[in-house]
């Protein structure tokens, strides 16, 4: 099973890449985390938020099209479901049991296109706070590693 993070944005600071890579490399080979970046669309007087999100959605769709048909879609959204660490660990176990990959979608500055959110099987909220998009990558990778560590009774998660 592969966990694919599809994130709008590129040219992140080095500390973002370092943080993400640290948690990605900790994952076991049978549960890899892969990052696929999508070029953001620039907002302008002729490019309103809806147009920006639609164009970014087309790029995200191209990435999703390269994944398996059984790929589950999880959209990160401020109105999504809150998971505790233990609940996320249980969800990760369920996804592994069901098979197929999981794609986590991180939108751009204007968020994810509503059509993408409608296609998602799960809407996930990482925090009630507004977070920088680069930090969301690191936080998501860390939480996926933490969830996996719970399923393995690994000492990383000590709650």
Curated annotation (Swiss-Prot):
Binding site for S-adenosyl-L-methionine: 76, 107, 126-131
Keywords recorded for this protein, A-Z: Cytoplasm, Methyltransferase, rRNA processing, S-adenosyl-L-methionine, Transferase
Gene Ontology MF terms: rRNA (pseudouridine-N3-)-methyltransferase activity
Species whose genome carries this gene: Cupriavidus pinatubonensis (strain JMP 134 / LMG 1197)
Catalytic activity: pseudouridine(1915) in 23S rRNA + S-adenosyl-L-methionine = N(3)-methylpseudouridine(1915) in 23S rRNA + S-adenosyl-L-homocysteine + H(+)
Chief subcellular location: cytoplasm
Keyword rRNA processing applies: yes
Locations listed in the record: Cytoplasm
Similarity-based family: Belongs to the RNA methyltransferase RlmH family.
Role description: Specifically methylates the pseudouridine at position 1915 (m3Psi1915) in 23S rRNA.
InterPro entries attached to this UniProt entry: Alpha/beta_knot_MTases, RlmH-like, tRNA_m1G_MTases_N
Protein name (database record): Ribosomal RNA large subunit methyltransferase H
Pfam assignment, any one: SPOUT_MTase
Organism taxonomic ancestry: Bacteria, Pseudomonadati, Pseudomonadota, Betaproteobacteria, Burkholderiales
Gene encoding the protein: rlmH
Superkingdom of the organism of origin: Bacteria
Enzyme Commission no: 2.1.1.177
Gene Ontology cellular component annotations, sorted alphabetically: cytoplasm
Subunit composition and interactions: Homodimer.
């Amino acid at each position: 099973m592969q966990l694919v993070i599809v994130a709008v944005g590129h040219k992140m600071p080095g500390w973002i890449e370092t943080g993400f890579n640290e948690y990605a490399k900790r994952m076991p080979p049978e549960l890899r985390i892969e990052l696929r970046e999508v070029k953001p669309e620039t907002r302008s007087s002729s490019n309103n938020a809806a147009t920006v999100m639609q164009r970014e959605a087309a790029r995200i769709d191209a990435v999703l099209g390269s994944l398996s048909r059984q790929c589950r879609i999880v959209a990160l959204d401020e109105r999504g479901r809150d998971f505790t660490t233990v609940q996320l660990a249980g969800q990760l176990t369920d996804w592994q049991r069901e098979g197929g990959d999981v794609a986590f979608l991180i939108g751009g500055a204007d968020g994810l296109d509503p059509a993408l959110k409608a296609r998602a099987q799960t809407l996930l909220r990482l925090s009630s706070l507004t977070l920088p998009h680069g930090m969301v990558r690191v936080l998501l990778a860390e939480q996926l590693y933490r969830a996996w560590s719970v399923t393995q009774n690994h000492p990383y998660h000590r709650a």
